[in-house]
Amino acid sequence: MAENRRMKKVNAMLREAIAKVILKDVKHPKISNRWITITRVSLSRDLQSACVYVSIMPHENSQEETLAALKASAGFIAFQASKDLVLKYFPDLNFYLEDIFSPQDHIESLLLKIAEQDKKTNP
């Protein structure tokens, strides 16, 4: 139980540190000036690697390009974030896209279809 609380605490601290670095220190053109949200961080049991799940607001560049830029900058992000956290070993960061906008878009399109059908049947 104590380990579970510890993991949650470390995950939260990692999430904050990584978000701060992305916001303030990363100067990559496909990362800066983008709406990037770190939705969650999942640290491995051995504390050697972390899965960082991000949500990227759609922009003129594709989300995949921004994700690729994050993956390319993972070492820099880890180095900068390690300055804020006191950990014996700082984990390797692996970024994954967590698309939270697609379900919303899907629901909105379904509601629009229902509204159109309703107009046709009840003029």
Curated annotation (Swiss-Prot):
- What's the short name of a Pfam family annotated to this entry? RBFA
PANTHER family, alphabetized:
RIBOSOME-BINDING FACTOR A, CHLOROPLASTIC-RELATED
Q: Which GO terms describe its molecular function?
A: ribosomal small subunit binding
Report the GO terms under cellular component: cytosol
Q: Which organism is it from?
A: Chlamydia trachomatis serovar A (strain ATCC VR-571B / DSM 19440 / HAR-13)
Q: Which UniProt keywords apply?
A: Cytoplasm, Ribosome biogenesis
User: Is Cytoplasm there in the keyword field?
Assistant: yes
Its main subcellular localisation, reduced to a broad class, is cytoplasm
Q: What is the protein name for this chain?
A: Ribosome-binding factor A
